[in-house]
C-alpha cells in the first residue's frame, strides 16, 4: 500500500515521503496512529500544497535574514568596560552583553547563542563578531569596547 508519511518514522520514512509499505503495517500502525495517510489524490495534493507553503516560508525567512544582515553590518555596538594597563579588560565582554546592548540601543533582538565568540572580548578596541542569522546568512557585527 502506498502511504504519505505525516511524521518521521524511524527506519521507514521521513515526513512528506511517499513509500510503499505492507498493507497490514499501514492500516494497523501507520494510519491508525497518525504517522501516515493513504496516498490518494487528496493526500498528494495536500502534500504538494504543504511543500509549496514551506518553500514560500523558507524564502521569506531567508529574505528577512538578508535584510537584517544589511542592517547589522552598518551598525557598531558601543560597550564600556573597566580595563588595566595595555588595554586589557578586567574580565571579558560576553555575547550576552553584546546582545543586551544591541537590544537596548538599536532595538534589534538577537539571541546570544547566534553570536560566535570563542572566549569573549578581552581587549579594548574594535572586534568583528560573526552572527549566524540563518543557515545560509552570516552577518558581521562591529563591537567597539571603550574604557569606562
Swiss-Prot record:
PROSITE patterns: RIBOSOMAL_L9 (PS00651)
Listed name of the protein: Large ribosomal subunit protein bL9
Key word Ribonucleoprotein present: yes
Keyword set, alphabetical order: Ribonucleoprotein, Ribosomal protein, RNA-binding, rRNA-binding
InterPro entries for the chain: Ribosomal_bL9, Ribosomal_bL9/RNase_H1_N, Ribosomal_bL9_bac/chp, Ribosomal_bL9_C, Ribosomal_bL9_C_sf, Ribosomal_bL9_N, Ribosomal_bL9_N_sf
GO BP term (any one): translation
Source organism (scientific name): Lysinibacillus sphaericus (strain C3-41)
Family: Belongs to the bacterial ribosomal protein bL9 family.
Listed Gene3D superfamilies: Ribosomal protein L9, C-terminal domain, Ribosomal protein L9, N-terminal domain
Function: Binds to the 23S rRNA.
Covalent S-S links between cysteines: none
UniProt xrefs under Pfam families: Ribosomal_L9_C, Ribosomal_L9_N
A GO molecular-function annotation: structural constituent of ribosome
Classification via HAMAP family: Ribosomal_bL9 (MF_00503)
One cellular-component annotation, GO: ribosome
